[in-house]
A protein has these predicted regions:
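Acetyl-CoA-dependent GNAT
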Residues: 5-107, 116-118, 122, 173-174, ...
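Conserved catalytic-core motifs of GNAT/GCN5-like acyltransferases
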Residues: 132-136, 147, 152-168
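Conserved GNAT acetyl-CoA-binding A-motif
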Residues: 123-134
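Short amphipathic helical patch at the helix-1/turn junction of helix-turn-helix
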Residues: 102, 136-137
Length: 190
């Protein structure tokens, strides 16, 4: 696999340029089956730039949120959203992955695994000891993906937005020398 470079967008960044929003919308629109499961867009088969801009603004309105844009050979292949802390549970010490989408035309190429490894390495290097995420119970493919990466179920509860049943998974983050290979020498940050 070619090198993956990850750019980040934080709440402090200015509005995203139109061309970048169009690229991000392409990733979102290519994940129709996922959006049919989530119901996050009114028509999962017709996701538009203003809808994605609003979704990203909503994600970035949460303190400590970051949008990660993964590129391979200049092409946007995946988008992820992370949170430094759970927005409704101040006692939870772990950061969270709120979203990881791989472009539909680039699935099964290792990009999701590489981006997940990059996110884990980023938080590990920041001194965090665990990483969590929630998967809709109806998304069995995502549940299998995350469990294959070493995430284990730790809770079951409704999500914050719509009350949909979710499995909460957690992965222990290895020390700075352990687990570095999984982060992928191909994943870097610009």
């Amino acid at each position: 696999m070619a090198a993956m470079y990850v750019d980040i967008v934080t709440p402090d960044d200015a509005a995203l340029p139109g061309a970048l929003l169009t690229e991000i919308t392409g990733v979102y629109a290519s994940a129709q089956a996922f959006h049919e499961l989530t119901g996050d867009f009114p028509d999962a088969g017709d996701i538009r730039v203003p809808q994605v801009a609003a979704a990203l603004a909503d994600e970035l309105s949460v303190p400590g949120s970051v949008v990660h844009l993964a590129r391979v050979r200049g092409d946007l292949v995946a988008v992820a959203v992370t949170l430094d802390h759970h927005p409704a549970d101040p006692d939870d010490p772990d950061p969270w992955i709120g979203l990881l989408l791989v472009h539909g035309e680039r699935r099964r190429e290792g990009h999701g695994r590489a981006l997940a490894g990059h996110l884990a390495a980023r938080f590990r290097e920041a001194g965090r000891t665990g990483l969590r995420l929630a998967v809709l119970d109806t998304n069995t493919t995502a549940l299998a993906f995350w469990q294959a990466l070493g995430y284990v179920p730790v809770d079951h509860r409704p999500d914050l937005r719509r009350g949909r049943e979710c499995t909460v998974l957690r992965r222990e983050l290895a020390g700075p020398r352990e687990g570095r290979a999984e982060a992928g020498a191909a994943a870097g940050e610009n």
